[in-house]
Regions:
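C-lobe/activation-segment region of protein kinase-like
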Residues: 233-327
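Conserved short submotifs of the Hanks-type protein kinase catalytic core
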Residues: 165-176
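Catalytic-loop of the protein kinase fold
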Residues: 212-222, 227
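Activation segment of protein kinase catalytic domains, centered on the conserved DFG
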Residues: 185-199
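Activation segment
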Residues: 60, 125, 175, 228-243
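Conserved hydrophobic alpha-helix
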Residues: 206-210
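Regulatory N- and C-terminal appendages and interdomain linkers associated
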Residues: 1-53, 60-68, 278, 296-328
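Conserved ATP-binding subdomain of kinase catalytic cores across diverse folds
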Residues: 28-167
Length: 328
């Protein structure tokens, strides 16, 4: 879809949704096709005027709904900065996620970079309390896992007791990178080579663009990146951190130390993903195998993978160790 077509669809859908009252919008979302439910929220697919729309419902806690905190990008729960990392984090708040979608949508509409899904509309909608996701369901265990602090407990219990959602209406891109790339790699030959070249180029372009503008994604695995087969779209900003947020001193220091995190993370993820997909190594074997390749070992016997696929492009061009600075 061209930039002009995306902007045109944005105008139509954004206007249509803005005209809906809360009750009608709630009914529209409730009638959508369920896609999933996870730690980041419930997702559905629906159509607005014939245009497919992806809807994400992010829990909005009572603390975030207080007048003094509405739209605040501050760390209102006082979470430790290391909650930016990893699987199962309670995340820092819905308003931060919204702010990033506003940023990225404006970048797309201004023609600065196309690699983000547009946000057509957002609304705070009431709804019944929902069970916590599996990763946080054991509140005491989750609190302990994230350092045991009182802020972590307030955050998780706030999510548990939430009776409203920040509902995001986003451009629908039907494929995530994980699923799409598996098909391309299975095809082998030129299809694999073209796909890997596009992915490598787009990962670098997208992370460089975000990071140069003070935005760190922090969760850019391949199920959080979408594709139309021609470019990548970075999505799911539940852990994103911007230098333009209202940051405390600890977060400013954390941000400064992690400016290269996205680039290292995406390179690491691509390499490990390819080795696992092509050769099927377990995690410990995979790390040893990647290091051996980067150090120039195994080239003769590993020209093709176990299914006859070529070894990941450019692996031996990075044997000087630059890649390994990002690969655990």
């Amino acid at each position: 879809v061209t930039g002009g077509a995306r902007a045109s669809a944005y105008g139509r859908v954004a206007t249509e949704l803005a005209l809906y009252g809360d009750l009608r919008l709630r009914e529209l979302v409730d009638g959508g096709e369920p896609i999933g439910r996870g730690i980041g929220g419930r997702t559905v697919r629906l159509e607005v005027g014939g245009t497919p729309v992806f809807v994400k419902q992010v829990r909005l806690t009572d603390l975030e709904r207080r007048a003094e905190n509405v739209h605040s990008t501050a760390n209102v729960f006082g979470l430790p900065a290391f909650c930016q990392y990893g699987y199962g984090t309670p995340a820092f708040g819905a308003w931060r996620e919204l702010a990033v979608h506003v940023m990225t949508t404006n970048w797309v509409l201004a023609g600065d970079h196309e690699g983000f899904p547009l946000m057509y509309h957002w609304r705070v909608l009431p709804g019944p309390r929902q069970p916590l996701p599996e990763e946080l369901a054991d509140v005491d265990g989750a609190v302990a896992a994230w350092g045991g602090g009182s802020g972590v407990r307030r955050r998780i219990e706030g999510l548990r007791d939430s009776s409203a959602s920040l509902t995001l209406f986003l451009e629908h891109v039907p494929q995530n990178l994980h699923d799409w790339l598996r098909v391309q790699v299975a095809a082998g030959g030129d299809a694999t080579a073209r796909a890997l070249a596009m992915v490598e180029e787009e990962l670098e372009a997208g992370t460089s663009f975000m990071n140069a503008r003070g935005l760190l994604h922090f969760d850019a695995h391949f199920e959080n990146i979408l594709t139309d087969g021609r470019r990548l779209f970075f999505a799911d900003f539940g852990l994103a951190l911007s230098s333009r947020f209202e940051l405390g001193q600890d977060e400013r220091e954390f941000f400064a130390l992690h400016r290269a995190y996205d680039r290292c993370y995406t390179v690491t993820h691509l390499v490990n993903w390819l080795v696992a997909e092509l050769f099927g190594h377990a995690a410990d074997q995979r790390r040893a195998y990647v290091r051996a390749l980067a150090e120039g070992e195994g080239r003769g016997g590993c020209a093709t993978g176990r299914r006859g696929h070529p070894r990941p492009a450019r692996a031996d061009r990075r044997s000087d160790g630059r890649l390994l600075a990002c690969v655990p």
